[in-house]
Amino acid sequence: MTWVRGGTIGRGSFATVSLAVSRAGEDRFPPLMAVKSCGVEDSATLRNETQVLSRLGDCQEVLRCYGDEYSCEGGRELYNVLLEYAAGGSLADYVRDFGALVESDVKRYARSILRGLDYIHGVGFVHCDVKLQNLLLCSSNDSVFCAKIGDFGLAKKAEKVAEKKGFRGTPMYMAPECLSGEEHSAAADIWALGCAVVEMASGKPAWQCQPGTDANALLFRIWGGKASPETPSELSEEGKDFLEKCFLRDPRKRWTAEMLLDHPFVAGTDVTVPLKQSDEASTSPRSPFDFPEWASDHAPSPTPDSEACFDRDLNSSSHSRTSPADRIRQLVTDQTPNWSVSESWFAVR
């Protein structure tokens, strides 16, 4: 290999992320990278990410991909994707470790993410899984970080999303139209961005639920009612108006990334800010609330705490033939959920 694998810095549902150091004399790669690896037999999602990143090309607000390679380690053939190293971890790591961001930082990061989404949508792709865990902090110089969009494993060309309906992404970031089985369009990415802004500003999950709250009832409320994530009271009026534009229930009326870039809340802001770093290695589970201690039951090595799994694959096209009510029921377990811990939620892939 042209690089040497270092320590593990994260684990996801389908892959493990490690540090990677270029071998001496290798000038195609930067000295330090992140390598995302999984078994060749389980590499469909990771291959999709590589293909999408290759099609996207170079964008300052998208995590850079340096290519892919195969390796044989421990008697197992691995598929590896070499990526830009995010020295600051994810925005989910920051919120977990330090709480809410000040509004000036929320503005800057929101603008950076919007630039990335505007580019992605302009090229004709939809990310399908925008959330704090997938928004990464990369060094831009010695003292500041910039936010970049990562994890394109669920991303699709917009027209292909329309051809195959079904659930994609994380339930509690899903727009109402996605819960009813409609296509995950660029507008759904904007709804998810709004959820991310709420979490950055409040330091709490976008849907703040008490222990004992019925998950089925909440998801039906998102789908069929007029509910949207609660706007943090500490946000300025501009910030509240920005979120209103993100949370318009009609996807045809919801503002686009291009429109939001001109909103007073983010217009004219810088995209890099000083930030503390967490000393802990992050994980990248695919749970609805992104708690790092949760590992999906779809992970290569499921945890003993995994108590149940879905009856069927939620990405299956068969969902287009089921009713909206049945689709939403598939997002929850038969057990009464405990909203205070992540084990009450399951990943949607």
Segments from the language model and where they lie:
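Structural motif in protein kinase domains
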Residues: A86-R96
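Protein kinase glycine-rich loop
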Residues: G6-G12, V17
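Glycine-rich ATP phosphate-binding loop
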Residues: T16-G39
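Terminal C-lobe "cap" of eukaryotic-type protein kinase domains
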Residues: L248-T272
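Activation segment signature within eukaryotic-like protein kinase domains
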Residues: Y109-A110
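Short beta-strand micro-motifs within the conserved protein kinase catalytic domain, predominantly
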Residues: R64-Y79
